[in-house]
Amino acid sequence: MAAAALEPWSAVAPRRRKRAAGRRPRPGEGPRAEPEADGEAVLRRLREAEEDLRISDFCSSALETITECLRKQLEQLQPLTEALGRLHLGSSLPSASQEPLASSASHVKCVCYGLGTFASCPTARIQLAFMLLFLEKCQVPRSHCWVYDPLFSQTEVSVLTSLGVTVLSENEEGKRSVQGQPTVFYMPHCGTALYNNLLWSNWSADALSRVLIIGNSFRGLEERLLARILQENYPYIAKVSDRIAGPGF
């Protein structure tokens, strides 16, 4: 299993700033979230966020890191694929060095949890734009991408559908099995329980070898939580935190 930690991003949920002494909020004033716009306006803002990310050094570096993680994962899986191919087909398959990432990535799935309300939250919109750029960079078809957030509005569901990704209708609570397919789980700042559920659902050497997580640092979770709490409430994270392979950015 590989993981890339998105430490620089803040949580999607807007935080309240401390008000200056004696200052009263103006009528209608709230968190930094924007009023939700119509679908066309949301798409326009999303395209603007994509363009901003394209010229960002952070985005470029992060995409290169993720691409390299995915390439290494697919290369490690290739010997098993070759062995199975020989068993069933009686002939060898192209080696990892012969097969480009784009060809291998066409078999990769992407599952996104916890994106946030991107129609009104700029941070969530940036996270969605980054996911779309990741799919483009690694040439993972959008039809191989599933997304879910319990807070999605109907406008956001319509926008995501128009982008070519599938919006899940049920809350899986992170309990999705990779079912033998390399799968990237894009989980920008999800709760610790979802990561634990994901590991539980794929708790075998074969399944974990096909999991790549873009999200919070497991080592960071380990440092922030008491060992007893981690062991009792999130045992699968505790088991892999010192064995996981993957950089932060």
Curated annotation (Swiss-Prot):
Q: Which GO terms describe its biological process?
A: heme biosynthetic process; regulation of circadian rhythm; regulation of heme biosynthetic process; rhythmic process
A Pfam family in this protein? SRR1
The record's InterPro entries line, in alphabetical order, gives: SRR1-like (IPR012942), SRR1L (IPR040044)
Q: Where in the cell is it found?
A: Cytoplasm
Record's note on what induces expression = Up-regulated by hemin and 5-aminolevulinic acid.
The UniProt regions of compositional bias labelled Basic and acidic residues, in chain numbering, are 26-40
Q: Where is the composition biased (Basic residues)?
A: 14-25
Q: Where is this region: Disordered?
A: 1-40
Q: A single GO CC term, please? A: cytoplasm
Q: Which keywords label this protein?
A: Biological rhythms, Cytoplasm, Heme biosynthesis
The text of the family note is: Belongs to the SRR1 family.
Q: Quote the PANTHER family the UniProt record gives.
A: SRR1-LIKE PROTEIN (PTHR28626:SF3)
Q: Say what the protein does.
A: Plays a role in the regulation of heme biosynthesis and in the regulation of the expression of core clock genes.
Name of the featured protein: SRR1-like protein
What is the organism field in this record?
Mus musculus (Mouse)
Gene that this polypeptide is encoded by: Srrd
